Amino acid sequence: MSNASKFGKVAVLLGGKSAEREVSLDSGAAVLEALVRSGVNAEAFDPKERSVTELVGYDRAFIVLHGRGGEDGQIQGVLEWLNIPYTGTGVQGSAIGMDKVKTKQIWQGSDLPTAPYRIISQESDLAEVVANLGLPLIIKPVHEGSSVGMSKVEKAEDLAAAIAKATQHDAVVMAEKWITGREFTISFLNGQPLPVIRLQPPADVAFYDYEAKYQRNDVEYGIPCGLSTEEEQKLQALCLRAFQAVGASGWGRIDAMQDEQGNFWLLEVNTVPGMTSHSSVSYTHLTLPT
């Protein structure tokens, strides 16, 4: 790239201390390789191994830190304090996007469709939760990404074990009504939606979980996505509203479902999506704007 020097010295922030460290290392390596190949003066920077004060002297930061500490507004706040420009969503939008409950509250307040949910614990009246939300349920740690700690629950007697699994990763756990249908993901670049991708996990996994996202080679990514042109445009517009509602900007991803009646439901926002070879967004297939 002829004007790569305009970016100056770029820190590719990767790794970190979250449960998604290994994914971040893989994503960061892919981003670093693509930047260097494009002629950018880029270096890997792992906040687990180095003090963030060592970022002084870098001109920009490309954030590829997944999960807590990197996707929740913390590193964004440090970079703003150091006056270093960075990629993606700012402090507030990152903090909201990392919190599944706050994200859903904002979407609900904006009249955007998202599945009913409850915050739960082992002390909750689990029979009441099942009566209210029905079965199946999806149990999620509120502040984790990459499907870490998530479980699909089809029988009420399995709910306590799923909560215990989720609480290994987060003190706050939610139960969400399971949406049966087709899953889609919509990436954003420069704040605008890209073509919709249909996700088709293998038949032997319950949902698009951590293993399917990063360890399996038999997940199908459908482009075209199988929606009509009108439906795809409707989903893109819906996800753009959802992306903007939480204060996300730059690049990111929204995951959504279409139920058996054809209705769309918003699942989650990802302000720093995975960029590994297994991810629905691979940095090596993107080009830097000139």
Feature-to-residue mapping (PLM):
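ATP-binding N-terminal substructure of ATP-dependent carboxylate-amine bond-forming enzymes
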Residues: 1-102, 109, 121-128
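Active-site nucleotide/adenylate-binding loops and adjacent lid/helix of ATP-dependent enzymes
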Residues: 1-14, 42, 52-53, 96-182
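Phosphate-binding site of ATP-dependent enzymes
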Residues: 154-237, 258-265
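Conserved metal-phosphate-binding beta-hairpin within the catalytic cores
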Residues: 177, 188, 243-275, 285
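Conserved small/polar residues in nucleotide/adenosyl-binding loops
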Residues: 284-290
